[in-house]
Regions:
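Alpha-helical transmembrane segments in inner-membrane proteins
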Residues: 1-249
């Protein structure tokens, strides 16, 4: 589905809601080391909820997106309510994380992310041929021997693990997961084995560029990278909706 991305289907919203709830319950002091695991746990809980609600003799990509959009809206409302009820210091700390920024990132964050990448990335690359088969349609995938629902569930969990870990340490930077794959498809006319690394590289470059602009364009102010990414991603999302409507007639 061209509209499916972690922020659209609610994975990012789940991580955000869990992080803000944690800050609201525990305050600001001493929470930085636990914030990332809590956010990652929130992403997995939401993913399980989406899977359960969207399951009807298997997972339908269209149904998955619809359920995810609904959950994302509800979780955004919960997050907003928690921010309103939070003390000013807690709300400010949560706001910085919610907008997405590399400002407080340290090398120990890279060390914490490494195990997720070392496990999830090779597994994703090994299984990508099944994603190529599924992109040709359900009947073709079944004919080629792909376990349709099992692999869909596996790819969903891998996506949650990779996206959730990134959100946990960089904050809720929206639309990168939507923009990068579409840009990669324009550059790489091949299967997912070549597409995935290029999309990951493009996503990283977008985030680094947005972070650089936020640091140097408004000196002495330091604006979060998520603001600039959202400024590009929101119009791009509208464009995808328009293009999808035309394709569907």
């Amino acid at each position: 589905n061209p509209l499916a991305s972690p922020d659209v289907i609610g994975i990012t919203s789940g991580a955000s809601a869990a992080a803000v709830l944690f800050l609201w319950l525990g305050g600001v002091t001493g929470t930085s080391l636990l914030l990332a695991p809590v956010a990652m746990g929130g992403a997995f809980v939401v993913a399980l909820g989406i899977t359960a609600l969207a399951w009807q003799k298997g997972i339908s990509p269209a149904r998955l997106v619809l359920v995810g959009v609904g959950l994302a809206a509800g979780l955004t409302a919960v997050t907003t309510l928690l921010l309103v009820l939070s003390p000013d210091a807690t709300a400010m700390n949560a706001y910085i994380w919610l907008t997405g920024s590399l400002y407080a990132s340290q090398w120990h964050d890279v060390t914490a992310l490494a195990p997720w990448l070392m496990v999830c990335w090779p597994l994703a690359l090994i299984k990508l041929r099944h994603l190529d088969a599924q992109s040709m349609g359900e009947d073709m995938a079944l004919g080629l021997g792909s376990a349709l629902q099992g692999h869909r569930l596996l790819f969903l969990m891998l996506a949650v693990a990779l996206a959730g870990s990134a959100v946990a340490y960089a904050g809720a930077v929206g639309f990168i997961g939507l923009i990068a794959p579409h840009m990669a498809r324009r550059l790489v006319n091949s299967g997912h084995t070549g597409l995935l690394p290029i999309a990951a590289l493009i996503g990283a470059l977008i985030l680094l560029y947005a972070d650089w602009v936020g640091r140097v364009a408004f000196i002495p102010r330091d604006l979060p990278a998520g603001i600039f990414v959202a400024g590009i991603g929101a119009p791009f999302f509208v464009y995808l909706l328009y293009r999808l409507r035309r394709e569907l007639g």
